[in-house]
C-alpha cells in the first residue's frame, strides 16, 4: 500500500450491524460527484468534506476493527469510486489483513455508479477495487423507489452484486439481502426504521444503512 497517499475520509464506525452481514467496520469516503436527491449523507458531497488522511493512518484505523473482533469492512460515502486509487489501495489492504468468515463478506463497497458504468471507465484502479472486493452495492439512490425494508439497500434500483461470482462467470450475479432484520445485541434492539415504527420500539437503534450519524468518529491519529 502506498502509505503516503492521502484520502478524504468522512468517518469510521466499529461494530456496525447496519451496513452488511456480520459485525462490520465502516469507513466513509468524503466527496461525491453524484449527489443523489435524498441522500442520507449530503454533508459528504463536497470534495473537501471530512479530512485528508494518509493511507498509513487509515490502514491503522481499519486494523483496529480486527482488534474489536469485527468480521468485515464496508466502504461507503460520499462516493468511494471518486477516489479510485485510494480505494484500490485500501481494498487490497483489507484483502491482505482481514480473515474470511462463513457467510460474511470480507469487503463490501457501496457506489452510486452502476457496475457497468464502473467497468466502462477502463481505469486500472477501478478494476483493482472491483477485483478485490467481495460485494458491490451499485446504483444511485432514487427517492421514488426508496424502501426502508430493503435491508442493505436504499432504493429498489440498487443491486447487491456478488463480485466473486461475477468474476468467475463473466455474468452479473446478484445476492438477495432484502429480508427485514431485527438484531438484539447486549440488550439493545437494532432494526430498520420502518420495523421499529411498526413494532413501537422506542429504544431501538435505527441508523439507516450507510448513514453517517454523530456516533462514528472522524479518522484521527
Where are the model-predicted features located?
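Conserved, mostly hydrophobic/aromatic
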Residues: 27, 36, 79, 136
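Short loop or secondary-structure boundary microenvironments that flank
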Residues: 29, 77-80, 195
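N-terminal pre-triad scaffold of radical SAM enzymes
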Residues: 7-35
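Auxiliary Fe-S-binding modules of radical SAM enzymes
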Residues: 2-17, 66, 112-113, 119-221
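Residues that scaffold the ATP/ADP-binding catalytic core of kinase and kinase-like folds
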Residues: 35-39, 163
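Short low-complexity stretches enriched in small and charged residues
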Residues: 26-33, 86-93, 149
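Glycine-centered flexibility motif
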Residues: 20-22, 31, 38, 63, ...
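Conserved Radical SAM active-site core
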Residues: 7-10, 23, 38-128
Amino acid at each position: 500500500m502506498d502509505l503516503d497517499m492521502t484520502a478524504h475520509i468522512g468517518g469510521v464506525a466499529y461494530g456496525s450491524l447496519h451496513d452488511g452481514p456480520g459485525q462490520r467496520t465502516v469507513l466513509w469516503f468524503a466527496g461525491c460527484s453524484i449527489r443523489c436527491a435524498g441522500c442520507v449523507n449530503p454533508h459528504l458531497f463536497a470534495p473537501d468534506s471530512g479530512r485528508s488522511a494518509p493511507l498509513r493512518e487509515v490502514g491503522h484505523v481499519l486494523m483496529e476493527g480486527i482488534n474489536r473482533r469485527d468480521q468485515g469492512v464496508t466502504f461507503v460515502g460520499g462516493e468511494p469510486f471518486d477516489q479510485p486509487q485510494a480505494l484500490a489501495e485500501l481494498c487490497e489492504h483489507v484483502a491482505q489483513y482481514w480473515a474470511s468468515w462463513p457467510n460474511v463478506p470480507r469487503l463490501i463497497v457501496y457506489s452510486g455508479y452502476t457496475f457497468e458504468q464502473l467497468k466502462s471507465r477502463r481505469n486500472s484502479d477501478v478494476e483493482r477495487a472491483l477485483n478485490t472486493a467481495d460485494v458491490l452495492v451499485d446504483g444511485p439512490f432514487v427517492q421514488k423507489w426508496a424502501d426502508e425494508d430493503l435491508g442493505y439497500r436504499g432504493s429498489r434500483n440498487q443491486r447487491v452484486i456478488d463480485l466473486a461470482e461475477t468474476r468467475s462467470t463473466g455474468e452479473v450475479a446478484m445476492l438477495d439481502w432484502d429480508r427485514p432484520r431485527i438484531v438484539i445485541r447486549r440488550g439493545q434492539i437494532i432494526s430498520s426504521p420502518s420495523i421499529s415504527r411498526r413494532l413501537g420500539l422506542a429504544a431501538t437503534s435505527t441508523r439507516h444503512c450507510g448513514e453517517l450519524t454523530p456516533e462514528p468518529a472522524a479518522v484521527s491519529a
